[in-house]
């Protein structure tokens, strides 16, 4: 920042989640520095907040090895062009939002040119490919981390890191309105309710749906009034789930929902879900849960050798103990899943204790992340 020009922040977001984070950061920065300039690779939300887009975010939003290889030349061209143009612009700070495979190399290129760099959202280096931490340390002046154990990991390697809390924890109330969610979904207040969330990826839905449905059938024997809600992320996953249900449990009555995962979690007494961000969201919804996950045997064998954590779900990683039951591979079968869910549906001591711990963990990571991120950017820009 100089007397001649406004504070200039360069940003690169590579997918929708990054666009949401970028928009929140820009909004918080504009409140403090109204004339700041924002430029880079932006999605519609960031652009709506005033970010000048040199490239559209969709240019970077490619998934899968085949898709990346098909777009590799274009991606390398964009990264080289951004290195050149940001180098000429000399922004006060560069913020790479997630998209580590693209952004960390770009951050390193810019840092060599004397530009201060932030990586916003830590990759899962604490879980696997831990040696990436050294590349991140060379490429960035600061990592912004959502979770406290991420900061503890970076501290071990003397990589500057700031824990800012999680934006999802800011967005969700500490005490959700369960009856309000049931009103929205048409679930009676006095019914037992189970949410099934078999994942957002096709492979997960294919691998988990049958066992999740069989588990629900077993639970219906104990709770004949059991309402079962199944939020599905899009029409393709819904069609896939309906096909599996027709084969496995054609007579099982369920509420299929288009999206509405958060409402389903808040409304339910318990959830059975695949691991991932859904487990964190379920914790923040204060819905007791069991995590069930299965992958192809070779993939699991490889993952066991690569992954360096004791748990797979974020609630357990945050708690530092097995707060929620994780049933993986051969353990992920209807009898064991149902046995783990029964005490949660009973709404007794087990689920109340889990609820209380969920609330404590929510408070720990509810830190107004947008404001914290903006403060970190401004401090680095000085």
Swiss-Prot record:
InterPro entries the UniProt entry points to: Glyco_trans_19
Keyword Glycosyltransferase appears in the UniProt entry: yes
Record-level Gene Ontology MF annotations: lipid-A-disaccharide synthase activity; phospholipid binding
Protein name: Lipid-A-disaccharide synthase
Keywords attached to this entry: Glycosyltransferase, Lipid A biosynthesis, Lipid biosynthesis, Lipid metabolism, Transferase
Function: Condensation of UDP-2,3-diacylglucosamine and 2,3-diacylglucosamine-1-phosphate to form lipid A disaccharide, a precursor of lipid A, a phosphorylated glycolipid that anchors the lipopolysaccharide to the outer membrane of the cell.
Lineage: superkingdom: Bacteria
Record pathway: Glycolipid biosynthesis; lipid IV(A) biosynthesis; lipid IV(A) from (3R)-3-hydroxytetradecanoyl-[acyl-carrier-protein] and UDP-N-acetyl-alpha-D-glucosamine: step 5/6
SUPFAM superfamilies for the chain: UDP-Glycosyltransferase/glycogen phosphorylase
Pfam families: LpxB
GO cellular component terms, semicolon-separated: membrane
GO biological process: lipid A biosynthetic process
Protein family membership: Belongs to the LpxB family.
EC id: 2.4.1.182
Keyword Lipid biosynthesis: yes
Reaction(s) the record says it catalyses: 2-N,3-O-bis[(3R)-3-hydroxytetradecanoyl]-alpha-D-glucosaminyl 1-phosphate + UDP-2-N,3-O-bis[(3R)-3-hydroxytetradecanoyl]-alpha-D-glucosamine = lipid A disaccharide (E. coli) + UDP + H(+); a lipid X + a UDP-2-N,3-O-bis[(3R)-3-hydroxyacyl]-alpha-D-glucosamine = a lipid A disaccharide + UDP + H(+)
Broad EC category: transferase
Lineage: Bacteria, Pseudomonadati, Pseudomonadota, Gammaproteobacteria, Enterobacterales
């Amino acid at each position: 920042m100089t007397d001649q020009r406004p504070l200039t922040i360069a940003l690169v977001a590579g997918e929708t989640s990054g666009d949401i984070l970028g928009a929140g950061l820009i909004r918080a920065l504009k409140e403090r520095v109204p004339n700041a300039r924002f430029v880079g690779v932006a999605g519609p939300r960031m652009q709506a907040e005033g970010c000048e887009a040199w490239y559209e975010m969709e240019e970077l939003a490619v998934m899968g090895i085949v898709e990346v290889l098909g777009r590799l030349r274009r991606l390398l061209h964009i990264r080289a062009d951004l290195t050149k143009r940001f180098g000429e612009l000399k922004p006060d700070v560069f913020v790479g939002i997630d998209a580590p495979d693209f952004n960390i190399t770009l951050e390193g290129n810019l840092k060599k040119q004397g530009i201060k760099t932030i990586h916003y959202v830590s990759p899962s280096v604490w879980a696997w490919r831990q040696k990436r931490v050294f590349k991140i340390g060379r490429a960035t002046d600061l990592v912004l981390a959502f979770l406290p154990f991420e900061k503890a990991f970076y501290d071990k390697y003397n990589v500057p890191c700031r824990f800012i809390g999680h934006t999802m924890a800011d967005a969700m109330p500490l005490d959700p309105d369960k009856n309000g969610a049931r009103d929205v979904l048409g679930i009676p207040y006095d019914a037992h309710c189970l949410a099934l969330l078999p994942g957002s990826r096709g492979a997960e839905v294919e691998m988990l749906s049958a066992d999740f449905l069989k588990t629900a059938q077993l639970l219906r024997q104990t709770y004949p009034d059991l309402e079962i809600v199944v939020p599905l992320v899009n029409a393709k996953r819904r069609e896939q789930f309906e096909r599996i249900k027709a084969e496995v449990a054609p007579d099982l009555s369920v509420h299929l929902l288009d999206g509405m995962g958060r409402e389903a979690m808040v409304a339910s007494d318990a959830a059975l879900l695949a691991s991932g961000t859904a487990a964190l969201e379920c914790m923040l919804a204060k819905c007791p849960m069991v995590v069930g996950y299965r992958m192809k045997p070779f993939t699991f064998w490889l993952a066991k050798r690569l992954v360096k954590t004791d748990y797979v779900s974020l609630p357990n990683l945050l708690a530092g103990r097995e707060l929620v039951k994780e049933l993986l591979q051969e353990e992920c079968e209807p009898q064991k899943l149902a046995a783990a869910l029964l005490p949660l549906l009973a709404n007794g001591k087990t689920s109340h204790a889990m609820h209380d711990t969920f609330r404590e963990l929510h408070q720990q990571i509810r830190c107004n992340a947008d404001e914290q991120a903006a403060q970190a950017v401004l401090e680095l820009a000085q």
